[in-house]
Amino acid sequence: MRNDDMAVVVNGVRKTYGKGKIVALDDVSFKVRRGEVIGLLGPNGAGKTTMVDILSTLTRPDAGSAIIAGYDVVSEPAGVRRSIMVTGQQVAVDDALSGEQNLVLFGRLWGLSKSAARKRAAELLEQFSLVHAGKRRVGTYSGGMRRRIDIACGLVVQPQVAFLDEPTTGLDPRSRQAIWDLVASFKKLGIATLLTTQYLEEADALSDRIILIDHGIIIAEGTANELKHRAGDTFCEIVPRDLKDLDAIVAALGSLLPEHHRAMLTPDSDRITMPAPDGIRMLVEAARRIDEARIELADIALRRPSLDHVFLAMTTDPTESLTHLVSGSAR
């Protein structure tokens, strides 16, 4: 792939804190094409926000390089800043100003004339369905409206790269869908997007590729379907109507339920999962055995691994992350 197709090129980036004792990022490399959406996933403290901070020139890497829209984040930070938009969980607009005033202010800061800034503000208020609230102080906006005006300010001049750090956290479903639609529009405009999110179904729906990072290291990369395939084959999920019947179901399934799956059951378990390489045949046989044992079920179905399964299978437990943090691994 030609370099001019690439909006983001990260090569061997390393970042440490505490005089090198805490490794936030360790030899991270990836590329993002123009118009591509990359989902950056990982548990808390994995290094996602540190990566966004480096790519947006808020902090410098200790080693490695990162090129954004042709500009080096260390030697050409001004060029990088002219080429990007960044939105995070904290809205970065002025609550004392109206939505329109914020947009005009950003336009003027970008060097637009007064008339051009007002015209662009009107266009963005229309695009983000905020015309009715344009004259109101942003401090009176709802969470979804505040997030939309924040993103709109980042689009006063179209960026080449967008960094969206958990943009839908805390939003209601309607506002969240509006952000999803916005990300889809970025693709059409050729804007490369790096999305961090705590909602795995969001990454599944929006991302062309997903990068899974844990303890500062990329542990998996690929499309959502490729990562799901790595997490395992189709499995059968069985939910009893009465949780007291779990042991009876285990007995009825017999050899269908592998020993290590039996060992995973705890007093708090509310369902049984087992591999189903034969798909529907396994489901039918399991249902037959349970029916013969006269056990009532709330549900029995074939499932495919979701990104939740990928996440749980490939990343460490948050309590382990705390242990690594104390001992000098990722931030």
UniProtKB/Swiss-Prot annotation:
Membrane topology note: Peripheral membrane protein
- Ranges of residues in domain ABC transporter: 8-240
* UniProt GO MF annotations: ATP binding; ATP hydrolysis activity
The places in or outside the cell where this protein is found are: Cell membrane
Q: InterPro entries per the record?
A: AAA+_ATPase, ABC_transporter-like_ATP-bd, ABC_transporter-like_CS, ABC_transporter_ATP-binding, DrrA, P-loop_NTPase
Q: How does it assemble?
A: The complex is composed of two ATP-binding proteins (DrrA) and two transmembrane proteins (DrrB and DrrC).
Task: Name the chain's protein.
Answer: Doxorubicin resistance ATP-binding protein DrrA
Organism annotation: Mycobacterium tuberculosis (strain ATCC 25618 / H37Rv)
